[in-house]
Amino acid sequence: MSDYIKMWRKEHAQILEVLLQVLQLDIFSRVGQTKLQELKRSLEAHLKSEDLGFFPVLKKAAETDTDLRRELFLFAADMDKIAAETRAFFRKVENDSMGKDIPAEFRRISAMIKSRIFREENLLMKEYEKVTSRK
């Protein structure tokens, strides 16, 4: 397993841990709010890392692999939706951190993020390892 994949898995594990912590805490508490901000920073850093180190490798391989190209297209559309909804959630928290729908919204985006991480690790990570092992 490459160092990048190890780092990527570690970032995923950290994101999942913070998601769990927020779900277990009172989201309206000081600690809950602090964890939400930690989650926001972790997600932003992880997405930047993916954009710089992960997806360029897969996109290059997809130039000659139509199945991978199709898979990346679907993942990109899914990520656009998740990113938009996650940004909207964090804007909502910034504007009304005590909004009554915040807990339900957080559970919803948490499920989306967890599902995305699971799919990335079980599909895209394998593709990445195949592509990088050919080099």
Model-derived segments and spans:
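Small-residue-biased structural context
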Residues: 1-135
